[in-house]
Amino acid sequence: ITNYDEIKEIINKQSKIDILVNNAGNNIPEHFTKVKTKNMEYLVKINTVATFNLAQLCALRMIKAKNRKKIGGAIVNMSSQMGHVGGPIRSVYNMNKWGLEGLTKGMSLDLAKYNIRVNTVCPTFVVTPMTKKFLKNKKFKRETLNNIPLGRFAELSEIASSVVFLASDAASMITGT
């Protein structure tokens, strides 16, 4: 996902692109004062730069699509509640997700004239293969659950439903969220 030339080649081989779900991301929890530069650069490259590049390449393909009555499409960026509220030992992740919120707002304005909608899904903590390792720490798990108003972790199916809705015609007037 971070190799621009490879991604560009893959995108350009597609006959058309209607939907992009930008869901690549990672997190390396570190206290702000202990963030290693290599970790920060890695996270920015995956969470921000790769997201930007993939969205731009797909938007260009959507705009250039032939044999369409109208240009259009949907881009759904996967963000996080950390893009709104932040959290300890996640300074770089918070920064990436706040940046993704700004990127989505700007993209939605720039791409609206092409009928391309751009939105984010900002879930709470979701149990995934990536997050399972964090949940092994009982203190972390307890503190995380205490900060989720519903008192439970999100299920992948709950997040997928939001993505499907935003990518569908049912959300045809929703952009910039």
What are these regions (language model features)?
Residues 33, 85-92, 113-114, 151, ...:
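Active-site loop immediately N-terminal to the catalytic Tyr-X3-Lys motif
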Residues 80:
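Residue(s) in the substrate-gating loop at a strand-loop-helix junction
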Residues 60, 109-113, 172:
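Alpha-helical segment proximal to the catalytic Tyr-Lys
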Residues 24-28:
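Conserved NAD(P)H cofactor-binding loop of Rossmann-fold oxidoreductase domains
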Residues 116, 152-177:
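C-terminal substrate-recognition "lid" of short-chain dehydrogenase/reductases
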